[in-house]
UniProtKB/Swiss-Prot annotation:
Top-level taxon: Bacteria
Upper lineage: Bacteria, Pseudomonadati, Pseudomonadota, Alphaproteobacteria, Rhodobacterales
GN (gene name): rplP
Protein name: Large ribosomal subunit protein uL16
CDD domains, per database record: Ribosomal_L16_L10e
Keyword match RNA-binding: yes
Summary of subunit composition and partner proteins: Part of the 50S ribosomal subunit.
Protein's organism: Cereibacter sphaeroides (strain ATCC 17025 / ATH 2.4.3)
Length: 137
């Protein structure tokens, strides 16, 4: 699964996801893409599940690009532990996704296969998405 090799700090504040994507909102690599329409944290497991669903439907044809990276550590405390005594340990890694962000791009397959593959990948994600085609702009 995806996670940073090293970070400057082990833990981060939760923060909030404000506004729309300032970058990464155009198709740069493939002809079809999956665009987020709402703000949410997407975990490394969810990204990997979506990638597997997309590549499985494409039957190893074409190419898939993952345009988001889980670089935010999410901490949690063990069950039945009282509040206080410091912040919990890192549980998983997540990517903060803003509306308008392209998350996946694919190329090298027909439009029907591409749309179905992206639809299957979108089912694995916790946010609503749109399928965009390069001819849209």
């Amino acid at each position: 699964m995806l996670q940073p090799k090293r970070t400057k700090f082990r833990k981060q504040h939760k923060g909030r996801i404000h506004g729309e994507a300032k970058g990464g909102f155009l198709l740069n690599f493939g002809g079809f893409g999956l665009k987020a329409t709402e703000p949410e944290r997407v975990t490394a497991r969810q990204i990997e599940a979506a990638r597997r669903a997309i590549t499985r439907h494409m039957k190893r044809q074409g190419r898939v690009w993952i345009r988001i990276f889980p670089d935010t550590p999410v901490t949690s405390k063990p069950t039945e532990v009282r509040m206080g005594k410091g912040k919990g340990s890192v549980d998983f890694w997540a990517a903060k996704v803003k509306p308008g962000r392209i998350m996946f791009e694919i190329d090298g397959v027909s439009e029907t296969i591409a749309r179905e593959a992206l639809r299957l990948g979108a089912m694995k994600l916790p946010i609503t998405t749109r399928i965009v085609v390069r001819e849209d702009w």
